[in-house]
Every structure is written in C-alpha cells, then in structure tokens.
Amino acid sequence: MDAALQSLSRFVADCAVLAPKVVNGRFGKMDVLHHRPTTSKLFLRKTIAAHSFSADEINVHDLMSDHPSFVDMYFCYSSPTAWAIVMDYVPCPDLFETLQTQGALDNALVVNIVRQLCDALNDLHNATGYIHNDVKLENVLYFGARDRVYLCDYGLCKREHSPVHDGTLEYFSPEKIRRHNYARSFDWYAVGVLAYKLLTGGRHPFERSADEVLDLASMRRRQQYNDPAALKNVRNLMARDFVFCLTRFNFECRSTDYKQIAKHSFLASRHDYI
C-alpha cells in the first residue's frame, strides 16, 4: 500500500461520524466526521453518487486550495458506486440559516459579506476560468468570529463557455434561462439576488408574496423590469441601486464586470460594521 492510501486508511479508521449532523442534498450526502486523535478536529465528508460526480468539483478544490474564502479538501476517494470528498468543517451557519434566525441583515454587514463574496468569485473566475454557477444563500457561509466569508459547494462549477444548464432557478439570469453557455455574468446576477435576500430577510426581488414559489414563467416575465422602484423592499437607495445594477434585464446596461461592481457606491462607501 502506498503512502497516500495508508494515510487515507488511517484517517478513515480514526474518524467517527457525528450522525446528528447528517445533511442530505440533491447532489450528495454530507456528514461531519470527528477525528478522534486530534480530539476536537472536525471534517465534512460529502458523498456523491458516481453518476452525479463531476471532476470539476475536485479541480476547483485543488486550484483554490490556498484561498481563504474557499474550503480546503484533504482527501478524495471513490468506490464503483460513489465518490467521497473530505474537507474542512467550517463551524458556522450558511446565509440561509443566518436569515432564519436573524432576519434582514443591516447594511454594513451585507456590504461586508458581499464584498468578500465578490472578491472570492473574481479570484475563481480569473485564476481558474471556472464559473461557480450556484451562488445562493445555502452555498455561502459567514463566520462572524473570523469575519470570513466562505464560498462552498463546487459541484456545479464549470468552465466558462460550457454548454451545461444547472443551478437554482430563482438565481438564474435571463441569459441562463435562455440557455446561453456558462458566463461570469451568471454568478454576478446571482450575487444581486443574494444581496436582495440579505437586505430583506430572504425575500426575492421578483416575488409578489413571501410564500410565493417562483416558476420559470414568472421569472421570465418579471425579470423584464426597468425601474429600481420595483425593489422598494430595500429602503437604502444605494443598496437598492446596487441590486438593480446587477439584476437589470438589459445585459448591455447590467453590471457584469468585477471592477465595475466593486466600485459601486454601496460597496465602496464606508459603513460602521467592525
């Protein structure tokens, strides 16, 4: 047995699964592992059926391994029916869970989170040529004690210009709905939707009521707005304009470039957060 297999074998033998932490998702099962020799060290293991596995997920882990906003991977192994990825366990809630407990976040915290998220996406785009393709509340963690945003779950990442169409409908840009090839603009549009949700406690910019489930037809129709007043649930005018700039229907008028987005007055202005 070579050194890598020996290391993996020892690691698996030394870990205990914390059953209460198990989470089952559409593209895999996740459970938390307690590494007994180190007493307190926890790892997250994602198990993916072989037919749902994408090597791009491993590539992104490898390519972004030194980035503070990406989750470190320690092992990846497979059987004939499944793959498993063992990575750092980040002990904090995702943004969906945060909104469930805290409601709408204050502007300063939203700016802090969105700035870090934009930086992480820009680094992913420029360093690897990958599009995350599933930016949403559930895939972004904010660890308040570290003041650190983590962008996670790389299972739907694809190279720019790939002709694949996956993700979460309520974050789809008009071009993604029209089944254009992967583009960086997909991620930036999703950031606009995510920012709106943070500012409103989980509401979607195009829903008519808090309990409405948006379908494809509703998204197609309501994306064609051209007045920031439609985003009236966001009271701060700079914040409202930021969301508007990232979610405008007309691609030529929309903010789709990191430098342009980072200079927006909402992100560039000073806020008393820390």
Curated annotation (Swiss-Prot):
Entry's family note: Belongs to the protein kinase superfamily. Ser/Thr protein kinase family.
Enzyme Commission number(s) of this protein: 2.7.11.1
Source species taxonomy: Viruses, Viruses incertae sedis, Naldaviricetes, Lefavirales, Baculoviridae
UniProt cross-references to Pfam families, sorted A to Z: Pkinase
UniProt domain Protein kinase: residue ranges: 16-273
Domain of life: Viruses
Protein name, as recorded: Serine/threonine-protein kinase 1
Residues that bind ATP: V22, V23, N24, G25, R26, F27, G28, K29, M30, K46
Active site: D134
PANTHER family cross-referenced by the UniProt entry: SERINE/THREONINE-PROTEIN KINASE
Keywords: ATP-binding, Kinase, Nucleotide-binding, Serine/threonine-protein kinase, Transferase
Catalytic activity as recorded in UniProt: L-seryl-[protein] + ATP = O-phospho-L-seryl-[protein] + ADP + H(+); L-threonyl-[protein] + ATP = O-phospho-L-threonyl-[protein] + ADP + H(+)
GO molecular function term, any single one: ATP binding
The keyword Cytoplasm appears for this protein: no
